[in-house]
Every structure is written in structure tokens, then in C-alpha cells.
A protein has these predicted regions:
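Canonical Radical SAM [4Fe-4S] cluster-binding loop centered on the CxxxCxxC motif
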Residues: 14-49
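A C-terminal junction/extension of Radical SAM enzymes
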Residues: 212-230
Length: 230
């Protein structure tokens, strides 16, 4: 696995920070609504970026950029993710990790070694709809729960985020979802947009009225629940 994409300037991926975003190759999920279909379904060898060249570019951004975001795909599938994060961190950048939470062991290592400043974890759905929402026949929800607990208890700062898609979330069990993220401090409910790059075409957003109902319900248990993109 390798880095296959770079956004050299982002004002959106790390709140209140100017960042560079690195996109890793491949993912262990197949969420039909994923916008990064090319990376998820596997970029070719020709798409791989030389990491030394990435570091050389980042050196020219010191003082201009606050942070580097490791995104994907699923970056915890990178065998040398820790090495790459350390190399970037040594240049003085903050580190944000975007993850689906399927690798709690590596996540805990990164947190325990103080290598992460912010983590954004996708919470796909309530447990009984999790695998379906991820485009899988089975998923180990226990690993998802472990990662949720790690962020709540160990992350310097974090957010959970759920992209609302009508085909998957109009059947969501609100109570089961609430229990899944019990103890969280921050959740973003994100608007789905059917755009070029999605793995499956023709899916639909959850309208703002229904999204607001879910936000209002969860606000009774989570200090910060916000709509994003609505």
C-alpha cells in the first residue's frame, strides 16, 4: 500500500487549520457512497507517489501549513504508517488521521506514542446495519467499539462523523446508534452528495428535516452534534 494522492492545500479537512492531505491506497470497506472510489478500489502502481518527494514538498510548506492529514482509502492499512507519520511530525506539522476504526491496535499505538493530534473516525451506522452500510457481508463491530473507546479516552482531540444516506440511514435504530457512541463529545452528521467518484451511483441524501431530527435526538447525549454540508 502507498500514498496515491495529495491535496496540497486544504482549508476543510482539519478545522481551523491549513493542511495538506495525503490519500492512501485501498480500503477494507466498500461503502457505496464513498467519494474516493478510485483509491478505495485500488490505484495502480503508476499512481504511487514517492514519499521522499512528498517530504521534500512538505519542507517547502513549513510555516505556511499547520497540519498534514493522513486520509484514504484507509490509512491504517499502510504497513509503514507510523514511520510516515513520524517523518512528517519531525518537520513540525500537526497530524490528523482519518480512519474507519477497523484497526484499534495500530490506533492505540499511535495514540500512546503521542503521534496524533486529531482523529476523525467514521461511524457508519448502528451495529445491525454496519456491514451493509460498509458494502460488506460481515464486519467485526467489536473493533469499531474498541476504536470509539480509544478516541474517547486517549485522543488529544477527535470527532466522529456519519454520512447520512437515505438508503442506509432511514432504517437506522437511533437508540442502538446512541449506545454505540456513548460517551462521545463530538459528532458531525454529514450530508451525502451523489458525485463523480462515488462507488455506487443514484443514492440519495437524507433531507435536512430528518437530519435535524437525528441531531436533536443525539444532542441529549452528546455535547456537540452538528450538521455538516446542510
Amino acid at each position: 500500500m502507498a500514498i496515491v494522492g495529495i491535496d496540497k492545500l486544504s482549508l476543510l479537512d482539519y478545522e481551523d487549520k491549513v493542511s495538506v492531505v495525503l490519500f492512501s491506497q485501498a480500503c477494507n470497506m466498500r461503502c457505496p457512497f464513498c467519494h474516493n472510489g478510485a483509491a478505495v478500489l485500488g490505484a495502480s502502481k503508476e499512481d504511487e507517489l514517492d514519499f521522499d518527494e512528498i517530504l521534500a514538498f512538505l519542507k517547502t510548506r513549513t510555516g505556511l501549513v499547520d497540519a498534514v492529514v493522513f486520509s484514504g482509502g484507509e490509512p491504517t492499512m499502510l504497513e509503514d504508517l507510523k514511520v510516515k507519520i513520524k517523518a512528517v511530525r519531525d518537520l513540525g506539522f500537526l497530524i490528523k488521521l482519518d480512519t474507519n476504526g477497523t484497526n484499534p491496535e495500530l490506533l492505540e499505538e499511535l495514540l500512546d506514542e503521542g503521534l496524533l493530534d486529531y482523529v476523525a473516525m467514521d461511524i457508519k451506522n448502528c451495529p445491525n446495519l454496519y456491514a451493509e452500510t460498509c458494502g460488506l457481508k460481515f464486519i467485526n463491530v467489536d473493533n469499531i467499539k474498541k476504536s470509539i473507546s480509544l478516541l474517547i479516552n486517549k485522543a488529544p482531540d477527535y470527532e466522529f462523523r456519519t454520512t447520512l444516506v437515505k438508503e442506509f440511514h432511514e432504517r437506522m435504530d437511533y437508540d442502538a446508534f446512541k449506545e454505540l457512541i456513548k460517551g462521545a463529545k463530538r459528532l458531525f452528521l454529514q450530508k451525502f452528495v451523489d458525485r463523480e467518484g462515488c462507488i455506487k451511483k443514484g443514492l440519495h441524501e437524507v433531507d435536512v428535516v430528518e437530519a435535524s431530527k437525528l441531531r436533536d435526538y443525539l444532542s441529549g447525549f452528546i455535547p456537540e452534534v452538528n450538521l455538516r454540508g446542510y
